[in-house]
Amino acid sequence: MAANLLEQLRGMTVVVADTGGIQSIATFTPRDATTNPSLITAAAQMPQYQSIIDDTLRQVRTELGAEAPVEAIVAEAIDELFVAFGLRILEIVPGRVSTEVDARLSYDTEATIAKARKLIGLYERAGIRRDRVLIKIASTWEGIRAAEVLEKEGIHCNLTLLFGFHQAVACAEAGVTLISPFVGRILDWYKKESGRDAFPGAEDPGVQSVTQIYNYYKKFGYATEVMGASFRNISEIIELAGCDLLTISPGLLEELRQTEALLERKLDPAIAESLELEQIHLDRDRFAELHQADRMANEKLDEGIRGFCKAIDTLEGLLKQRLAVLEGKAVFHHAAHEVFSVCDLDGDGFITREEWLGSDAVFDALDLNKDGKLNEEDLLAGLGATLQMAGRAVATV
């Protein structure tokens, strides 16, 4: 009986988990893992990761101080949160984790370099070596130039949102560690453009793109690794067996694990080296010319950057809401303690109706067990109801 497809694939390709979900990574035990803003934003809304969010927000508030504005707290927390998830992932995988630079910096070389250095600094502060982290950067001309600088500093880069052959060539010439061509998104574009429902097997345009890039890299001896990404079905994965790396979602990993069939290696360095190919070189103008001519790559890169920017904006909103709740709790705890201290005139740990400085109606509302006295928890419970109402109000803004 043949082994399952996942086991066979691991014998010829490095399997990477494409998820921000720590539990999924633990289930499939990949060598590496990749994350992106959309995955982290999704994970941030799952109850099992609430402690990571809360701990990060509290830590940043402590670091920046009580007077720091909410915007500064949230901006810093996003960087720290990406690294916090990365650290949890690195406790599971033996290899590398990819952490993405803010997509809003995709056309700013210097800002991308600065952000990458900061992220690596956060990892190093936590005791993680540089060789265990890949900094994900969009494959714009500006992003590729940033990666070229970072690679010379020993900061390894994963160039993402790669759709065109010209992007792959520029990345190889820049000496980046790894690229992530988006197989499924390329397929999506051609299906919409052509009106076809499917492109089976080797006809899949995304598969053809990765195959072309892989063969070119191996033919001309580029060290840059090719990691196929964004798969829509296991057929695409089967057609790219032998690629350096493939980053695969948990759902497709499970489907591969449940499928027993013989897996044939499709990509091979020896075959690539035997091909007749022409080597090309790109400067900024030639890159721009080719990018403009490749409508699919042009549109999908723009769409991908906008999508990741939207995910970051959403994450910022979620963190602002959560910070308001966390800091509201602290305020209410303090307020309850202050009110209790003022009213507990004899210091016996209770406030009687005679000691209460407010109205009888409020006292009766707080005295839930109707024993004629209030403790600090009674006050906190009453204020807590107000807090919950405030939290719901913030969530609807």
Curated annotation (Swiss-Prot):
Its EC number is 2.2.1.2. PROSITE patterns: TRANSALDOLASE_1 (PS01054), TRANSALDOLASE_2 (PS00958). Keywords: Cytoplasm, Pentose shunt, Schiff base, Transferase. GO terms for biological process: carbohydrate metabolic process; pentose-phosphate shunt. SUPFAM superfamilies: Aldolase, EF-hand. It is found in: Cytoplasm. The keyword Transferase applies. It is an enzyme of class 2 (transferase). The active site is at K136. Transmembrane segments: none annotated. It catalyses: D-sedoheptulose 7-phosphate + D-glyceraldehyde 3-phosphate = D-erythrose 4-phosphate + beta-D-fructose 6-phosphate. Its main location: cytoplasm. Transaldolase is important for the balance of metabolites in the pentose-phosphate pathway. PANTHER family: TRANSALDOLASE. Homodimer. Belongs to the transaldolase family. Type 1 subfamily. This is Transaldolase. It comes from Synechococcus sp. (strain ATCC 27144 / PCC 6301 / SAUG 1402/1) (Anacystis nidulans).
